[in-house]
Amino acid sequence: MFKIKQVADLKWNYILSSHRLKLMHWSTLAISTCIIFSIIANIRAPDFIRILFYLLSGFLIYKLHLKLKHLRYEADYYLILRESLLYVLHTNRLYTTYKDSSGYEKIIRSATLEYELDRQKGHVLIKALITGDEFSKKVQSLDDVLAGVLELELDEKIIRPSFVEYHFFYKKPERLVLQSHNQKQEIDNLDINLGYGVIFNPIKCPHILVSGGTGSGKSIFISVLILEFFKRKSTIYIADPKNSDLGSLSHYLGDKYVATTPNNIARIVRLVVEEMQERYQYMRDNFQYGSNFADHGFKPVWLLVDELGAFQASAGTDKKSKETIVEVMDGIKQIILLGRQAGIFILVSAQQMRAETLNTDLRDNLGLRIALGANSNEGYRMVFGSATPDKLKPIEEKGAGYLYMQGSGKETAQYWESPYLDTAQFDFIKELQLYLTETN
C-alpha cells in the first residue's frame, strides 16, 4: 500500500486527500462495472451464459469494492488526521505568506506538525516542531486547539528541546476486572498487571505510595496487591495503627505478621530491616556481579504500612514513645533507600501524604505513586511533586485516580482506574486462604 506522509505543513501541496480517495474508490468501481458489462454485452453466447457472467461480474465487483473500502479505511485515519492538523495551522494563522508581482499570495513558511498513529493502542502522537521561528512559541500552547479539532482529551504534553509532544487516546484503556479462582496461582515473574496498560515490577520501580480518603477504593486496591504479592510467594508484614481492615487480617496471617500497636509495629519493622541486612550479608559472602535478590534465590518481602500519619499520631509524647516513632521511621527510611537489591519493598498508605508524614526526598524514592479519589491540587502535589499534571480530569469512578510510575516514560501522573473488585462476587478472604499454607 502507498505510504502517506505523516506531516502537516501548509507549504506543501498534497495530492492525496480523504475526498479524492473517496472519488478514486467510486470512480474505479464505476469504470470497472462499465467495462466488464460492455464486454459481456458483446459476447455471443446464450442468454443463460451471459446471465451467469453478469452474476459472476457482480460478485467480482463487490469483492473489488470491499478491497478498495478496506484500503480507503486504512488510509482515511491518516488523511483525516492530516487534514485536521492542516486546518489547525490555517485557522490559527501559523504560516507566513508572500505576494508576488502578479498579486498571487503564496505560503513561504509554515509551522510543522508531525503525527504518529498507533491503532492497536488507540494512541495519537502529534509533534509540533520547534525551529526557532515565530511559530515556535505558539506551537507550545496548542493543547485546547488540538483537543477540540480531534474531539479527544489531551492525555499528556511533553515539551522537548526541538518539538512538543501532544498525546491523545481515542480508545479508553481497559480496566482490569478481578475474577475468583478456586485454586492457588503461582507466578514466577514479578510483573503485576494493574490494568489501564500499567505493568508494575518492583525491581524496576521499587516501593509504592497510595494516597486516598474514605471511599476512594484504597483498601480494596491494597487487598488486590496483597493477593498479587502472595501469588509471587512474597512474605508480607502489615502495620495498621488504626486496626481497621488490614489489621483484621491478623486472624488469618497471625500476630507475627500483622501489627496494630506502636511497639508491635516497631517489632515487625525491625524484623524486616534485619532480614534486609542478613540478605545483604549473604549476597556479599556469595558475591555475583550485577546480581540481585532473585539471583540468590530470595523471594520478595513486603512491608505494608497503612495510615503512616495515624501511627505517628498514635504514639504518646513520652520519651519511650518518641523513641519508638524514631526507630520505625528510621527503619522505613532504610527500607526505602536500601531495600530494592535485597528484595525488601514497602507500601506506604495515607489519607494525605504530608511532608511531616514522609519527607519529600523519601517520597520521591517511592517508584509507584497513586492518588485515589478526588483530591485538591495541593494533595496531588504532596503525592507526585514535580510529576503533578497541569490539567486534572474529574474523578467520577470509585477506585479511579492518578498514577505515576518511575521509568514508564511518562513525565507526569496519568489518569488511571484501579482493578475492579466486585465485593458481592469476589470473596477476598477465601482467595487469601488459598495462599496461607506455604506463605507467612
Show the residue positions of the predicted features.
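Mechanochemical coupling/switch segment within NTP-driven translocation systems
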Residues: 235-237, 249-302
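Loop/turn-to-beta-strand initiation segments
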Residues: 233-235, 298-302, 339-348
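Residue-level signature of catalytic and energy-coupling elements of molecular machines
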Residues: 146, 210, 240, 272, ...
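Conserved ATP-driven motor cores of ASCE-family P-loop NTPases powering translocation/secretion/packaging/pilus
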Residues: 137-144, 349-440
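Substrate-engagement module of ASCE P-loop NTPases
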Residues: 268-276, 323-347, 375
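Residues immediately C-terminal
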Residues: 244, 310-314, 338, 354-355
